Amino acid sequence: RIEEARNFCNKLWNVARFIQDQVDIKNTEDSLQPTTAADHWILSKLQRLTDGVASDLNMYAFAEAYDKIYHFVWDDFADWYIESSKTTPNHGVLKFSLESILKICHPFAPFVTETIWQSLKWSTDLLITSSWPVIPKSDTSHYKQFEEIKAIVTESRQLTKTMGLQKPSLVHSSDLLESNQELVQRLAKVAQSQEQG
């Protein structure tokens, strides 16, 4: 558990560093405007996390709350959303998500989260005095779209690993994949994604 906690704190540091590198310090007032399916998906996931952790804390279910936070940060945010944002970064969603994560994590890792918060280029106050995050509702249709992309990418990765393929091509007949071609190529690690003729 100690090693897991240490790795989790390192992950938080790395995520914060990546987002700070992405965000333009001259424009720290990026508005929260989700534009991609991934943006809507992560905000929906964040809303569920916020509600779930708040409920767990009220019931003193600290282990359950920590597990929710751990899997969200490690899987949903770092593995999926951060990787997706490397294609089309949304500074507003990245900043808002990071701030919300730090607020939610603060009861479990107060010193680490406060230190990260103070290192943010746009931070002007103390994390301990900030309010619990309020997550805006997101588009459920976009959430489902990204879930579909995730499922296809996961299956593609598994097939690539099982068959020992090097930089395979993904042939499909999906309008969704066609409109998210660059994203799919990045996430699935394929040479190209092309529509089936």
Tell me what each language-model feature is:
Residues 19, 56, 72, 80, ...:
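Short alpha-helical functional segments enriched in proximate histidine and acidic residues
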Residues 1-2, 70-71, 87-91, 101, ...:
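Conserved short loop/turn motifs at secondary-structure junctions
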Residues 7-20, 39-48, 66-85:
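Core structural elements
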